[in-house]
C-alpha cells in the first residue's frame, strides 16, 4: 500500500455503524439538471423515523452499506452518493411517506436500462428497516435520455410505413392462445385481417411449443397476411413473437421474420429482460422492423399500491429500452387501470414533454427531447360497446386490440373483425363531426348497427358484459 493511500484511508475513519441520515439525508440539497430523480413510497418499520428510512433508500441504492468502511476515504462520496432531499407524508395513509432521492448521473452506465434498475431497485427492496417500498416515478435527465436509441421507429414512422392515418389502429390477439396448430392459427390470422383489422397478434406465451413451433407459425402467418393484403389493398401485420430462451435465438427469429418481409415482430420485455429487449430494438431499427412489446409479468411488479414499481416507471424504461407499441391497460376492460393514472403514463409514452401533474401520478416533469414516442395498446376484455370510450380515452395514436371481442363473434372471426372496424369508423366519423363520444357513444354504435349486420350481432352478444371492479391503482 502506498503512503498516500494509507494516509487518505486512515484520516477521519472511525469503524462502526452510524445512522444513514447523517450522510444521506440532505434536505438542503438543490437538485441538478443531470440528476436522476426518484420518488419512493416508503413504509418504515415501527420505530424507524421517515428521515432514516428515506436516507437508507438513498444509501443502499447508491454508495452506502450497513457499516462504515475505510474505502470510503478512497473516493468522493459527496460526488457519487444518492441523496434523500425531501420527504412528505402520503395523504390518507398512516406511516407512509414519499421520499425523493437524487442520484448523480455518473452512477449509471450510458444506454443501459439494466444498469439503471440494478442500481436503483436492485437491492434496497429487501431492506429490513422498511416494511414496504414502491418506486412511484423517475425523472430521467435529458443528458441520460440522449444515450438511448429508444423506440426502433416511433409513431409517425409507423403510420408512414402502414399508410394509415387519422384513426386508432385495430388489432386482435389470436385465441385460444395455446393449442392451435400453425395452419389453423394462420387461418384465424387471415380471417381477422381480411375482415378489416390492421394487426393480429401472438399471445405473450406463444413462443415455440411442441404443438406449434415458431418457424411453422411464422410461415403460415406470413402467408395469411400477404393473402389478406392482396384482397383488401391495405398493409397488414402480425406480431410475430420473437421472445426466446436466449438472446441468440431471439435474434434468429427476428432475422427470419425480416427475411419473410413482415412489418413487425414482438417481444415480452419484462420476462425477456431489458438487455434482450434493447438488443432486439437495435436490430429492428437497423432492419426496418416495427417492435410490439407485451408487458407480461408487470402486475407481479406494479399492482400492489405500497410495494413494487409503478407501471409508469416500467413504461418510461420501455421507451428508453425500445419498443413501438406497449400494452397499457384499457380503463374500461377486464384489466387493472384507473383513468387518470393510465392517461398519465400514456402521455409519458407518446409525448415529447410532460409536465408534473400529481393528480395523474406524474411526480416529475419529463423531457424526452428527440426520443420517438410509443403507441399505447389497449387490450383485455374489450368489445364493440367499448369502442366509443376507447376512442375518446386513447385518441388516434393508439392500438385497440380485441381478442375475444373479435374471435368470439357468433358468426366467426372475419365478421368479428368487420364489426370492430365498422364500430371504429363510426366513432371516428362521429368524433370528427363534433359529437361527444362519452355521452353519445351507445347511440352512435346503435345507429351504425343499421348498416352492419356483423356489428348488430356483436352488440347483441356483448350487451350485458361489464367488468366493474374497483381499481387498486389509485392515487
From Swiss-Prot:
Write down the top EC class of this protein.
lyase
For the modification N6,N6,N6-trimethyllysine, which residues carry it? 14
What are the recorded Gene Ontology BP terms?
photorespiration; reductive pentose-phosphate cycle
Record has Metal-binding as a keyword:
yes
Which residues does the entry assign to the active site, renumbered to this chain?
175, 294
Listed InterPro entries: RuBisCO (IPR033966), RuBisCo_large_chain_AS (IPR020878), RuBisCO_lsu_C (IPR000685), RuBisCO_lsu_C_sf (IPR036376), RuBisCO_lsu_fd_N (IPR017443), RuBisCO_lsu_N_sf (IPR036422), RuBisCO_lsuI (IPR020888)
Q: Self-association or partners: how does it assemble?
A: Heterohexadecamer of 8 large chains and 8 small chains; disulfide-linked. The disulfide link is formed within the large subunit homodimers.
User: By what name is this protein known?
Assistant: Ribulose bisphosphate carboxylase large chain
Species the sequence originates in: Pelargonium hortorum
Which gene produces this protein? rbcL-A
Amino acid at each position: 500500500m502506498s503512503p498516500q493511500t494509507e494516509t487518505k484511508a486512515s484520516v477521519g475513519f472511525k469503524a462502526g455503524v452510524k445512522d444513514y441520515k447523517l450522510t444521506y439525508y440532505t434536505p438542503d440539497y438543490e437538485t441538478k439538471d443531470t440528476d436522476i430523480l426518484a420518488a419512493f413510497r416508503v413504509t418504515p418499520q415501527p420505530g424507524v423515523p421517515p428521515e432514516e428510512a428515506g436516507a437508507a433508500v438513498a444509501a443502499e441504492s447508491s454508495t452506502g452499506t450497513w457499516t462504515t468502511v475505510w474505502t470510503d476515504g478512497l473516493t468522493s462520496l459527496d460526488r457519487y452518493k444518492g441523496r434523500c432531499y425531501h420527504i412528505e407524508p402520503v395523504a390518507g395513509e398512516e406511516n407512509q411517506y414519499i421520499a425523493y432521492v437524487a442520484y448523480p448521473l455518473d452512477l449509471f452506465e450510458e444506454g443501459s436500462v439494466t444498469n439503471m434498475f440494478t442500481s436503483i431497485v436492485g437491492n434496497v427492496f429487501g431492506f429490513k428497516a422498511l416494511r414496504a417500498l414502491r418506486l412511484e416515478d423517475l425523472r430521467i435527465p435529458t443528458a441520460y435520455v440522449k444515450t438511448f436509441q429508444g423506440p426502433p421507429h416511433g409513431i409517425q414512422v409507423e403510420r408512414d410505413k402502414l399508410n394509415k392515418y387519422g384513426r386508432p389502429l385495430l388489432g386482435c390477439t389470436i385465441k385460444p392462445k395455446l393449442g392451435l396448430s400453425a395452419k389453423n392459427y394462420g387461418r384465424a390470422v387471415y380471417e381477422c385481417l381480411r375482415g378489416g383489422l390492421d394487426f393480429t397478434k401472438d399471445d405473450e406465451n406463444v413462443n415455440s411449443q411442441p404443438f406449434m413451433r415458431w418457424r411453422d407459425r411464422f410461415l403460415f402467418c406470413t402467408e395469411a397476411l400477404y393473402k389478406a393484403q392482396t384482397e383488401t389493398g391495405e398493409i397488414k401485420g402480425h406480431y410475430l413473437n420473437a421472445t426466446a430462451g436466449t438472446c441468440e435465438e431471439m435474434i434468429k427469429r427476428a432475422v427470419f421474420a425480416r427475411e419473410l418481409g413482415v412489418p413487425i415482430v414482438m417481444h415480452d420485455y419484462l420476462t425477456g429482460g431489458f438487455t434482450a429487449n434493447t438488443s432486439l430494438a437495435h436490430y429492428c431499427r437497423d432492419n426496418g422492423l416495427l417492435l410490439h412489446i407485451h408487458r407480461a409479468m408487470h402486475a407481479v411488479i406494479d399492482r400492489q399500491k405500497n410495494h413494487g414499481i409503478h407501471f409508469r416507471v416500467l413504461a418510461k424504461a420501455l421507451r428508453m429500452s425500445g419498443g413501438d407499441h406497449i400494452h397499457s391497460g384499457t380503463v374500461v376492460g377486464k384489466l387493472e387501470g384507473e383513468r387518470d393514472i393510465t392517461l398519465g403514463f400514456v402521455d409519458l409514452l407518446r409525448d415529447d414533454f410532460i409536465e408534473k401533474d400529481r393528480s395523474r401520478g406524474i411526480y416529475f416533469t419529463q423531457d424526452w427531447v428527440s426520443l420517438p414516442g410509443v403507441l399505447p395498446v389497449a387490450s383485455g376484455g374489450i368489445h364493440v360497446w367499448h369502442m366509443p370510450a376507447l376512442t375518446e380515452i386513447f385518441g388516434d395514436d393508439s392500438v385497440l386490440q380485441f381478442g375475444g371481442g373479435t374471435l368470439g363473434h357468433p358468426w366467426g372471426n372475419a365478421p368479428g373483425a368487420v364489426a370492430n372496424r365498422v364500430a371504429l369508423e363510426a366513432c371516428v366519423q362521429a368524433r370528427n363531426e363534433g359529437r361527444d363520444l362519452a355521452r353519445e357513444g351507445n347511440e352512435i354504435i346503435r345507429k351504425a348497427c343499421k348498416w352492419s349486420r356483423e356489428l348488430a350481432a356483436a352488440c347483441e352478444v356483448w350487451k350485458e358484459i361489464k367488468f366493474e371492479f374497483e381499481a387498486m391503482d389509485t392515487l
